[in-house]
């Protein structure tokens, strides 16, 4: 049996080479590499347990520069790693075959698309026996500190497992554009503010209207005065054209935003519908938890206040049969689709 400082490889062999590296404990496993194909069998990963911040910890700027250099990306902030796409390609680079890049959404912009990528990453971790729990719910929110902590751990994991073999990230993505996700604080709803004075139709009209004095009618207007209305009118037309272009861009942006919101709505509605069907299947078992879930699903907006919720619970205990009457309704009754 191995001693307290020894570890067993997946083959059952003693592996007495645990490394202590500035607060980072690295427990190596056996890695079998077939030259030419880089074929990995499951259980090959070198697990890294980061216990403290060391001098080797990279700054936010250095870590983003490293990600962009390795994967040929154009990320500008640590928060943009919340899509999970970069981690998926890192795993393909370290352990070819453990993840399918065709399934990775490199242009993910919505939270459920981020979750999809992290599910693929978690599956690849499981295949390679990576002993790391991915805090998906925190990462997909795009908060800086959560994403910085995870990428700093992943950098140490990468250094412990990378064998130095050349890797073409663009070719591996098979032509997929790896666009960085939108910044959490700069969503598509935050359209640029425009000056009402500079772009308003009345501003151009005010500039174009020539000043005239009542009662003074020049008998012979000069050529310069004749050219003035023409030039001011063309300037007004240009201002209007610019405004039309800006408004068209706003309409396009709002359409994209609406499509994203509708996708999220359909996604979460589908989840609620699945929960409803499960509750209906077990509704006849007189399960209190099922009835409570049904009450939450069918609760309308006016019944969601804290006070009325307590009153509803008291009525439920007094009249148990009233809870079962909600089974005839559907969760779709609380959704209004345009």
Curated annotation (Swiss-Prot):
Pfam families, sorted: CH (PF00307), EB1 (PF03271)
Calponin-homology (CH) domain mapped to chain residues: 57-159
Low complexity bias spans: 200-234, 328-338
Location(s), subcellular: Cytoplasm; Cytoplasm, Cytoskeleton
InterPro entries tied to this protein: CH_dom, CH_dom_sf, EB1_C, EB1_C_sf, MAPRE
Residues covered by region (Disordered): 1-21, 171-241, 300-338
Gene Ontology cellular component annotations, sorted alphabetically: cytoplasmic microtubule; microtubule organizing center; microtubule plus-end; spindle midzone
Main location: cytoplasm
GO MF, one example: microtubule plus-end binding
Keywords: Cell cycle, Cell division, Cytoplasm, Cytoskeleton, Microtubule, Mitosis
Any GO BP annotation: regulation of microtubule polymerization or depolymerization
EB1 C-terminal domain: residues covered: 236-306
Basic and acidic residues composition bias: residue spans: 300-327
Family recorded in the similarity comment: Belongs to the MAPRE family.
Function: May be involved in microtubule polymerization, and spindle function by stabilizing microtubules and anchoring them at centrosomes.
Protein name: Microtubule-associated protein RP/EB family member 2
Species: Gallus gallus
């Amino acid at each position: 049996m191995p001693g307290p400082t020894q570890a067993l490889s997946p083959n059952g062999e003693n592996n007495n080479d645990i490394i202590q590296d500035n607060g980072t404990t690295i427990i190596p496993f056996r890695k079998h590499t077939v030259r030419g194909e880089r074929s990995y069998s499951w259980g090959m990963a070198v697990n890294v347990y980061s216990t403290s911040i060391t001098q080797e910890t990279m700054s936010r700027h250095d870590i983003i520069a490293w990600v962009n250099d390795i994967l040929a990306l154009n990320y500008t902030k640590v928060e943009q790693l919340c899509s999970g796409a970069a981690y998926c390609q890192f795993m393909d680079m370290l352990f070819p075959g453990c993840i399918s890049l065709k399934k990775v959404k490199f242009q993910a912009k919505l939270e459920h698309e981020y979750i999809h990528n992290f599910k693929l990453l978690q599956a690849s971790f499981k295949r390679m026996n990576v002993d790391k729990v991915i805090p998906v719910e925190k990462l997909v929110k795009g908060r800086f500190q959560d994403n910085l902590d995870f990428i700093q751990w992943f950098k140490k994991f990468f250094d412990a497992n990378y064998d130095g073999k050349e890797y073409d990230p663009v070719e591996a993505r098979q032509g997929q554009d790896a666009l960085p996700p939108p910044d959490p604080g700069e969503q598509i709803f935050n359209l640029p503010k425009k000056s009402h004075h500079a772009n308003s139709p009345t501003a151009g009209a005010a500039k174009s209207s020539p000043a005239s004095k009542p009662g003074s009618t020049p008998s012979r207007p000069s050529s310069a005065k004749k050219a003035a209305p023409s030039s001011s009118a063309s300037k007004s037309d240009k201002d209007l054209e610019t405004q039309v272009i800006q408004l068209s861009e706003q309409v396009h942006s709002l359409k994209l935003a609406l499509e994203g919101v509708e996708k999220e709505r359909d996604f979460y509605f589908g989840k609620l519908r699945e929960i409803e069907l499960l509750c209906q299947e077990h509704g006849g078992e007189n399960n209190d938890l099922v009835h409570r879930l049904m009450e939450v699903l069918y609760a309308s907006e006016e019944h969601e206040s804290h006070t009325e919720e307590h009153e509803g619970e008291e009525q439920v205990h007094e009249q148990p049969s009233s809870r079962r009457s909600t089974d005839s309704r559907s969760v779709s009754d609380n959704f209004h689709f345009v």
